[in-house]
Amino acid sequence: EPITTGLKTYPSVLNKKGTYTQSSQLTITESEVGSSKIYCEVRRGESVWIKEIPDCKGDKVHPTVILTQSSSEEITSRRFATVLCSIIDFHPESITVSWLKDGQHMESGFVTSPTCGVNGTFSATSRLTVPAREWFTNKVYTCQVSHQGVTQSRNITGSQVPCSCNDPVIKLLPPSIEQVLLEATVTLNCIVSNAPYGVNVSWTQEQKSLKSEIAVQPGEDADSVISTVNISTQAWLSGAEFYCVVNHQDLPTPLRASIHKEEVKDLREPSVSILLSPAEDVSAQRFLSLTCLVRGFSPREIFVKWTINDKSVNPGNYKNTEVMAENDNSSYFIYSLLSIAAEEWASGASYSCVVGHEAIPLKIINRTVNKSSGKPSFVNISLALLDTVNSCQ
């Protein structure tokens, strides 16, 4: 007898191979399931195809329950263990799945998803996630399945092998000196090494939560997490304390680390000079070097870069040494080497060594030299040039 209610047939769809696909959907009530056989009949011309629809309602069938777990190597590397409880071939659909740890019911950490099989029975999976540190404490985990008055339990024991999972380590990085001197906001970085799965990283300033961003595993190792927060430059310069807080269910208490701008009592302004190749070398070589010597400054935070005709030079085209202490250990120096083509020098281009340091009255100074200048000239960089340097980074 043809069915006329609860039926929805969708338009034919042209496939890439030039054939068509058509779908038909039948909706019935739960009470109608199993009351009679249902067939899908397809006619095309004189051809007829008939397919019986499987019935998900039938005799009572209790499930088969199987437990599997991830390997110890995977648990150590991913920082969590996965236990899969497979509940296979049961009928009717209604089941209850519970997880126990050492005989105590667990309230969270697992997800259960039932599905209907094509053979008229149901199957389901329940996935339990356990932090690695907890897994390696030899606890017993139980998947308990109740179906039609019958309860089945399957146990699995965590590894007795000690976990090689070290405690998380927090490393805080201050903003770059270039950010501090040139921008209205600066970025603080919190690097969490040995980060467990599901770690939460947040920032606070004197009990006030700050909006931050987190990136997973961009650090030096696969188990690191980096969280960044943007604050005003003024707040950083004020010496305020900023806290990175690491939370995880595996930690007895949250881990905290703080950072602030250190107060500098001995500010020393740097001297800047450019060292040129000897005149005879310039005429004899295709390339020549400009060396910028910056010395006598304190504290050690500084940036040095170059411009050609007031346009920033790509950092890959010059080389800065590490900041080094001078003989008295109370001040520092740094070299920057720029290689240029002799033809460019001969054309009259102007080369500037741009230096930023908090002891400089205008925060930035430069030395400029070109073929016709005779000797390097010292210039306090103007606000207009400051904007140019900043925009060309």
From Swiss-Prot:
PROSITE patterns: IG_LIKE, IG_MHC. The keyword Transcription regulation does not apply. Keywords: Glycoprotein, Immunoglobulin domain, Repeat. It comes from the Eukaryota. InterPro entries: Ig-like_dom, Ig-like_dom_sf, Ig-like_fold, Ig/MHC_CS, Ig_C1-set, Immune_Resp_Modulators. Residues 63-157, 168-260, 270-370 form the Ig-like domain. Glycans are attached at residues 119, 155, 200, 230, 329, 366, 370, 380. Gene3D superfamilies: Immunoglobulins (2.60.40.10). This is Ig heavy chain C region. It comes from Heterodontus francisci (Horn shark).
